[in-house]
Every structure is written in structure tokens, then in C-alpha cells.
Amino acid sequence: MEGSWFHRKRFSFYLLLGFLLQGRGVTFTINCSGFGQHGADPTALNSVFNRKPFRPVTNISVPTQVNISFAMSAILDVNEQLHLLSSFLWLEMVWDNPFISWNPEECEGITKMSMAAKNLWLPDIFIIELMDVDKTPKGLTAYVSNEGRIRYKKPMKVDSICNLDIFYFPFDQQNCTLTFSSFLYTVDSMLLDMEKEVWEITDASRNILQTHGEWELLGLSKATAKLSRGGNLYDQIVFYVAIRRRPSLYVINLLVPSGFLVAIDALSFYLPVKSGNRVPFKITLLLGYNVFLLMMSDLLPTSGTPLIGVYFALCLSLMVGSLLETIFITHLLHVATTQPPPLPRWLHSLLLHCNSPGRCCPTAPQKENKGPGLTPTHLPGVKEPEVSAGQMPGPAEAELTGGSEWTRAQREHEAQKQHSVELWLQFSHAMDAMLFRLYLLFMASSIITVICLWNT
């Protein structure tokens, strides 16, 4: 008796499989005797539940069309190091089951009902870019209409791979893809289509977007494609998700403080070099900028080379260059006030060229030289008193003459030294002004270049 029962069950299975393989199926109407005010009797749908392992078609050569749609309710995170987009989606799939139908007039006016999704055949739609295990909650339900249309919705936390371009950080826009496809069914068995238009999906996503953090949704677009794998074609729908970073956090915490520090470094050129305060001030400012970069390093992407990193490198280079310039000018002043060598002729010519009106830098009005200078006897047109012939100086007069000549030579030496010191001081101030202008020019051109690159 037990063996005959087994053979009967096996015969029924092979008979059903034969009908499916031959392209023939059976449609039927659900008996409404199990319908009432408390819902439907599960036994009335047993014939549908028993077909759950098989694709619901009456002709196996006809592919099942699955319409998909989704709404993005949250952009959770964008991992620049791993190139991952974490989002939360509400996925909706709609398809027809020809084995389900009933007459609403005979079934208490019921046009649709909900039933456990585990009792129905479900499309194996997945996201190709998904980089984590599907964490869809269990025990979901699906809505079934009296015409056999099934509407199934499920929430999904999606960690998808996304090729991020962080060069324009923090003013960057990213384009990520979400590709929906079947894992098992080829184009001969399943076709994908849209349940809603793209603009409807975009508006719905913007309306229910619950996160107002670092990223905002710009828009969605879609494309259809066919994936060839192992000689089989799989239908696909590719959604392009455009998102944009909100840069206010990084502008306030990174760009503005860095700009202030560079501006203070530029203003420090107005500190007099002779006071000795410019070098310590610039060293303190440089150390403070390095501490600032160390504290803010957690806000920067850890992969790639963003443009903001180039901006910080330029700011650091400007500060180091200004410190070296100050050290150079301080050394010139030290040389000028201790043992100034004779100023080379070409430097003297360059200094005269720069001191001329409208040249390299404005010069202070020349002060009258009140120090020891040339004696009147060395001025043009003035001759030394001649000694009368036949008048030989005596010993006392010779001693006085020798002393006056030594004093005159010493005065000439002091005058030449003072003149050399003044020339070196003028040269130092001219170099300081010229290097300051070069500093401003390089700073302005660098900042303008970075801003133009950010705006492209």
C-alpha cells in the first residue's frame, strides 16, 4: 500500500513536469467557498502554494515579465577607502501568476489579499554591485489581486561597490550604479521592465529621504543591458545614482582655518626684520599649521589624492618659503651690520635700477649723510694748500701733518664702511620687498588655480 502511494505521487510529479516541458499549463479559478469576513481559508489556495517551486507560467517557452521599482529612503554612508555606498532601499517587484484568479462578485467583493511571501514563487532579483549578504527580514507578505498580479515589497540595506572619484573633495559628485538582474533565469525565462518611470522614482526618493547628513541625492537615470555569462544572456536594468557631498563641514573646518593661517603668514612680512620677531613668529605659525593638519587628518579621504591635499601642500610650501626668505634677509642684515664686503658692481647697478621711481619697490627719501665723509680737500675744484718754496716744515709741523693725514685716512675708511653698510641695507630691504611681492603672486595664482579646478 505504501509503495503504491509513492508511485502515485511520483507519477503525478512527472505528469506535471511533462505538461510544463511540453508548453502546456492549466489555469483555474480559486473556489470562493473559503472566503469570508475573516479572510480566505488557506486550503482554498493550496493548489497555488503547491506550485511555489515552479515559475508561474502556462507556457514554459513564454518568459515571465517582472517589473521592478525602488525608492531610496536613506544614504547611510560613503566609504572612500573601500569605495562603498551604503543606502537603504524599498524594492518593489510586480509580476503575474496565471494560476491565481477569482471572481470578486462571488468572493465577498474581495479584489486583493495579502499572503505570506514564503508561500509564493518569488523572482531571484539581486543587485550585482552588492558587497554584503542580503539581510532582507523574514516573514514578509505580498499583495495578490484577483487577476493574479502579485506585488511584493521588501526593505534592503545595500552596501554596493561604487567607483569614487575624490579628486574634487569636498566639492565632489559621485555616480554610483545599481544593476538589477536575475541570478538564475535567462532572457528566455525572465524579462525585466520598469514598474514606474524614472522621474517618479526620483521624486519618491527625494520625498522619503530621511537622512540630511553629508550626502544629497541629485537624480536617477536608467539603462537596459544584457549580461552574457557562460553562453547565456541575462536581462538587466542599470540605475545610475547621482549624489553630491555637502561641503559646509569641510569648508568651515578645513579651508577657512587654513586660509586664515596663510593670510596671517603674509601679513607677518610687515614685521620689521631688525626687531628679531619675524622669524620666531613664522616658526610658531608653521608649527601651528602642522598641528592643525594632524588634527584634521581624520576628515580627509584616506585613498587617492584629492585636490584639497594639493591645496594644503601649497599652503605649507608658502609658509616654509616665507620662513626661508626671512632667514635670508636676516642673514643679509647681519652681514651688513658686522663686516660688510664691498657691494658687487652688478648688485649696485641692480639696486640703482630698483631705487629709480616706478621700479621694483618704493624707496624712502634719502637722508642727508651726517656721518663722516670726504674732506673738503677731496671735493672737485678744491686744492690742498701748497707749501712755499724754501719753507721746510719743522719737526713739530711734520708731526702735526702726519697726524692729520692719518685722521683723514681713518675718516675716509669710516665713510666708505658706512656707505657700504647703507648700500647693503638698501639691498636687503629691496630684496625683502621683491620676495614679498613674489610670495603674494605665487599665493594668489595658486589659490586661483585650485578654485578654478574645483569649479570645473
Swiss-Prot record:
Q: What is its main location?
A: membrane
Q: Fetch the Pfam families from UniProt.
A: Neur_chan_LBD, Neur_chan_memb
Catalytic reaction annotation: Na(+)(in) = Na(+)(out); K(+)(in) = K(+)(out); Ca(2+)(in) = Ca(2+)(out)
Q: Name one GO molecular function term.
A: excitatory extracellular ligand-gated monoatomic ion channel activity
Q: Which GO terms describe its biological process?
A: chemical synaptic transmission; inorganic cation transmembrane transport; monoatomic ion transmembrane transport; regulation of membrane potential; serotonin receptor signaling pathway; serotonin-gated cation-selective signaling pathway
Q: List the disulfide bonds.
A: 162-176
Q: What family, per the record?
A: Belongs to the ligand-gated ion channel (TC 1.A.9) family. 5-hydroxytryptamine receptor (TC 1.A.9.2) subfamily. HTR3E sub-subfamily.
Reproduce the free-text note on domains from the UniProt record: The HA-stretch region of HTR3E seems to confer increased conductance to HTR3A/HTR3E heteropentamers compared to that of HTR3A homopentamers.
UniProt-recorded name of the protein? 5-hydroxytryptamine receptor 3E
The major lineage groups are: Eukaryota, Metazoa, Chordata, Craniata, Vertebrata
